[in-house]
Amino acid sequence: MIDGGTGVALRTVRWGNPEDSTFAPLVLIHGLASNAMLWEGAALEFAALGHAVVAVDLRGHGLSEKPDTGYDMQTVTNDVAGVLQVLAAQGYERPVVAGQSWGGNVVVELAHLFPELVRGVVAVDGGFLELQEHFPQWDECAVALRPPNLLGTPVSRMRGYMEGAHPDWPKTGIDGSMANFEQLPDGTIRPWLTLERHLMVLRGLWEHKPTHIYKDITVPVMFVPAEGPSGVFSDTKRQAIERALHSVPKVRVEWFSPADHDLHAQHPVRFAQVVHAATIDGFFS
């Protein structure tokens, strides 16, 4: 657990260590209602490629502390910056920071506000999300994107659903998805992120406008969007990525097609190889 000075202790999971690594360290940030372990497949590949890796449970998620407030983009980004400052003293200096979906928006905000802490950022099917373009009114967004009530679902049923919905995912992806839930003594699940906090995170994402800060970002940004029927806002995604290509000063795009929104869980080896290549070809220099 790391408290980076914001008063909330965040759980970290590590693979490899800086002393034995050859290449840039990596810090991995999950999406809304997800958790650090959904990165496990990619983290194992990163470590095998010579990177020291840390994945973080953001506030309210996984095994991190769960305050009742502080789920706006600024506060969550401050949490991550505080963790990076602690990690820097432990040998993880200026990592490449990857974030998925909501986490993609978080790392873009991080690159804007704290460029001195990162070598660059990777936005995985995120970093371009501007929910107000799709839902001008918050109430409309809150209804449309309200999560399903999974409380009380048997563990076995949930795992069976995951395996059926994602037949091409490796075991690390299924296990990581199951880690979104606390497993109760009666054999049922409870999401680590409560509905109330979920909606607070969603409100913070709805308020965030990453395109307004693109031109001011001074570190490299890699966008890794997913293309497919299950992608987020597939109809406007290419337009959003084109906007990023024309606005972010140092930018690269690596499309995964076809791919799920959680492409890092679905294709962990390929994802790790794409990011690793950018750490050795000079993009993240």
Give residue ranges: language-model regions:
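Active-site loop/oxyanion-hole signature of alpha/beta-hydrolase fold enzymes
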Residues: 5, 48, 54-98, 102, ...
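Catalytic histidine-centered segment of alpha/beta-hydrolase-like enzymes
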Residues: 256-268, 272
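Short beta-to-alpha linker loops that shape the active-site pocket of alpha/beta-hydrolase fold enzymes
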Residues: 42, 57-60, 67, 127, ...
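Conserved loop-alpha-helix segment in the C-terminal half of the alpha/beta-hydrolase fold
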Residues: 218-259
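Alpha/beta-hydrolase
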Residues: 156-232
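Flexible "cap/lid" loop of the alpha/beta hydrolase fold
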Residues: 108, 112, 119-153
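Conserved HGGG/HGGXW glycine-rich cap/lid loop of the alpha/beta-hydrolase fold
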Residues: 13-63
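N-terminal cap/lid segment of alpha/beta-hydrolase-fold proteins
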Residues: 1-9
